């Protein structure tokens, strides 16, 4: 139909692609929340879900705290994530959290991939 035709080739196209993708940000939820699980779930059209890069870089280690590290009134948590497309998973070499800076209530993350 007309609506679907305009979606093809646009940023909103939902067809599976062979491209690599990295998705980062402050998701304001914990690693086991439903919103995170949804990002990791394959799409109905066959496109794979995203992969959390933290366990790829740090197997068997819980996600590092990324928020409220420098606020003594709050408990540190992990709200910031780096996700990669499944075809980038084997290329993840490191993921680090800069715990030193207090420029924000969220800590910066640095992903290293080898292509």
Feature roles, as predicted:
Residues 1-115:
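Active-site regions of metal-assisted phosphoester/phosphodiester hydrolases
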């Amino acid at each position: 139909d007309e609506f679907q035709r305009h979606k093809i080739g646009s940023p909103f196209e939902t067809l599976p692609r062979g491209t690599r993708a990295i998705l980062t940000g402050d998701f304001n939820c914990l690693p086991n929340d439903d919103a995170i699980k949804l990002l990791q779930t394959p799409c109905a059209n066959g496109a794979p879900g995203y992969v959390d890069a933290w366990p790829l870089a740090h197997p068997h280690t819980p996600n590092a705290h990324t928020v409220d590290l420098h606020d003594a009134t709050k408990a540190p948590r992990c709200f910031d994530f780096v996700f990669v497309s499944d075809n980038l998973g084997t290329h993840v070499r490191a993921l680090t959290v800069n715990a030193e800076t207090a420029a924000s209530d969220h800590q910066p993350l640095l992903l290293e991939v080898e292509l």
